[in-house]
Amino acid sequence: MGALTSPRKVVVLGSTGSIGLSTLSLFEESGAPVQILALTAGRNVERLIEQARRWKPSLAVIEDESRLDDLRAGLAGTGVEAAAGADAVRDAAAMGADWVMSAIVGAAGLAPTVAAARTGAVIALANKESLVCAGPALLAIAKAAGGSVIPVDSEHSAIFQVLQSECAHRVSRLILTASGGPFRTWDKAAMARATPEQAIAHPNWSMGAKISVDSATMMNKGLEMIEASYLFATPEDRVDVVIHPQSVIHSLVEYVDGSTLAQLGPPDMRAPIACAFAWPDRLPWPAPRLDLAAYGQLTFESPDVERFPAIGIAREALRLGGGAPAAMNAANEVAVAAFLDRRIGFLDIAGAVAGTLERMNSLGDLSVAESDAVETAMLIDGSARRIAAEVVAQKRQRA
């Protein structure tokens, strides 16, 4: 894509969540040339109505079918078509946009992201679960359709900007930074008593509840390791994690000659969204500027894998390959939901994920045929959720 002149046709999947809000905020502040074709949301019909009235998309979709009448009433007289359900979300993704923001949380984002990739659109990928569950297949689908996948996670956006594709064979390590989350300095006894309210209080980033809990367990970083391995064709043993509490350095690329390149910036998700929207151009907008003197110092430490076992679980899933990452992700979604519902403790989350992965591996349920990788990933997702629910129930009985 060259200079940003003519309007780009845009679909925002998950427009009412944190990333969706940041995307529309960026468009508002930058005056980016966009024509919104569709906005989709899960349950927040009030916010979706507000967005649709502002941006006048052709279509607004609420996944919760029970809210369709509310959506229609809220959009009466606007000319915006209202629809509901998972199929309608997939239809919105496949409308033929130039650029699709994939920001639906969880494995629910996989099918719409694949549908968008089949159209040849540029996929701005914030839904990390799509890559974790079916990364190689998703990337192949996008490439075959003439499209591309540009990561929106700040860590992968950093690597994307720093890593020159023609130099990929000269890379020795990818280094993902992690804030350490709200429990970075807590001991295990304190973590065992952690409440959902404490877990979602991220020190640097404004995120939804599920992603905030993933940051607290460091499963977020485990998922991102898998993403990085797939996105940048890098083996698991060459993807490292370092704790960087200030969240200023977003990731680093170490080359074989010992040189290390990093991308820096204030912790604001609109920056990687702007990169994904304009690449290889740059989008002028009133971005927060980095004042290194104000920070004074940037600090780093190794992750404590004993207190935060999720990183090791993710490495094991990546080593197992096949459907193991999809199973791990599904189990994590079930366990996090149980924690947010106060059915299990914070430290039970990683145990439930590890237990599910072990059971599925012992049953031989993790093999994936390349020809139907996406469909198989969805089946594995369902199986893992059922097993994870059993594991969670057992942990609750023992509590």
Swiss-Prot record:
Q: Which UniProt keywords apply?
A: Isoprene biosynthesis, Manganese, Metal-binding, NADP, Oxidoreductase
Q: Which cysteines are disulphide-bonded?
A: none
Q: What is its EC number?
A: 1.1.1.267
Q: Which domain of life is it from?
A: Bacteria
Q: Which SUPFAM superfamilies match?
A: 1-deoxy-D-xylulose-5-phosphate reductoisomerase, C-terminal domain, Glyceraldehyde-3-phosphate dehydrogenase-like, C-terminal domain, NAD(P)-binding Rossmann-fold domains
- Tell me the PANTHER family matching this sequence: 1-DEOXY-D-XYLULOSE 5-PHOSPHATE REDUCTOISOMERASE, 1-DEOXY-D-XYLULOSE 5-PHOSPHATE REDUCTOISOMERASE, CHLOROPLASTIC
Quote the function comment for this protein. Catalyzes the NADPH-dependent rearrangement and reduction of 1-deoxy-D-xylulose-5-phosphate (DXP) to 2-C-methyl-D-erythritol 4-phosphate (MEP).
- What name goes with this protein? 1-deoxy-D-xylulose 5-phosphate reductoisomerase
Query: Source species, please?
Result: Caulobacter vibrioides (strain NA1000 / CB15N) (Caulobacter crescentus)
Gene this chain is encoded by: dxr
